[in-house]
Swiss-Prot record:
Ranges for domain GH18: 5-283
Statement: the UniProt record of this protein carries the keyword Hydrolase: yes
GO biological processes: carbohydrate metabolic process
Keyword Transport applies: no
Name assigned to this protein: RuBisCO-associated protein
Protein family according to the UniProt entry: Belongs to the glycosyl hydrolase 18 family.
Taxonomic placement: Eukaryota, Viridiplantae, Streptophyta, Embryophyta, Tracheophyta
Origin: domain of life: Eukaryota
Length: 283
């Protein structure tokens, strides 16, 4: 396996990560809990975040035991909270009666509580739909991450971008303003991009590297795919893993992120992922 392949991230809402077999030569395993939202039902809470992952399966005690399991090993494990949404449901907003500073204050307080309760290491920002102007998004999200980092509540901060131009512009601006507080960028390869039919692998690889170039100063650029069949509309799993095989020798790519959500929603078992990644990364 290429020594450049270092980070493996699982994006999940349940405890499927507990039995995950980590791909060979990985130096860091990240679990990203999906999701915390500042919504109570369908109503925005203007920065007051609530865990919406399976809190019966993923408890503070479960995370404590998970981390303890790897203490004797050389593998670093980190657990992050992901804030965001999917499609048009629960979009980012600071509320009609709110403002950026008020949102940042409320978000910092609520996420501080979640991070301390669950002993989390970082935050991931993954909004696919943003119902705010660019300045409000950048100032709010950037201010939140800055507060968490400066108060030493987290050690890892990432955001997820894609080929969706309307969405990506928000993250370009966020990174331009707050680059020092983000160490990881995740590219959601299945969102907003359809590879050419003539040469899908080459066109997907070209797109990934173009996006990676926009964030070339970041510590870790991860390429993401999904085990959920509804996310496969633009291209199938084999296209992704063949593309990953070609990318892992490239210094621009530091690892992979796999969206599992739960064992119940995955269209191929999570236990296959390490084997597929090993095949993709073998040289």
């Amino acid at each position: 396996m290429s020594t450049k392949f270092k980070v493996f991230r699982e994006f999940t809402s349940d405890d499927s990560f507990l039995n995950q077999v980590i791909p060979e030569n990985i130096t860091e395993f990240q679990v990203t809990l999906s999701l915390a939202r500042d919504y109570d039902g369908n109503n925005s809470t203007n920065g007051k975040f609530i865990p919406y992952w399976d809190t019966e399966k993923v408890t503070p005690e479960v995370i404590k035991k998970f981390k303890k399991k790897y203490e004797p090993t050389a593998l670093r494990v980190k657990v992050l909270v992901s804030i965001g949404n999917k499609n048009k449901q629960f979009p980012f907003t600071i509320g009609s009666d709110s403002n950026s500073e008020a949102w940042v204050s409320e978000a910092t307080a609520s996420l501080k509580s979640i991070i301390k309760t669950y002993n989390l290491d970082g935050i991931d920002v993954s909004y696919e739909d943003i119902a705010a102007n660019e300045a409000d998004f950048v100032n709010s999200v950037g201010g939140l991450v800055r507060n968490l980092k400066q108060n030493k509540l987290i050690t890892v901060a990432s955001f997820a971008t894609s080929a969706d131009a309307a969405n990506n512009k928000f993250y370009n601006l966020l990174y331009a303003e707050y680059a020092t507080f983000f160490d990881t960028v995740v590219f959601l390869s299945w969102v907003g991009f359809t590879p050419s039919r003539a040469n899908p692998v080459a066109s997907l690889e070209e797109k990934i590297l173009a996006v990676a170039n926009e964030y070339k100063a970041v510590k870790a650029f991860l390429v993401a795919y999904s085990t959920v069949a509804e996310d496969w509309a633009n291209f199938s799993p084999p296209i992704f893993f063949i593309t990953l095989h070609g990318l892992l020798g490239n210094s621009a790519v530091k690892g992979a992120s796999i969206k599992v959500i739960s064992d119940a929603t995955a269209s191929f078992p999570a236990k296959w992922i390490p084997e597929i990644l090993l095949l993709a990364a073998s040289k």
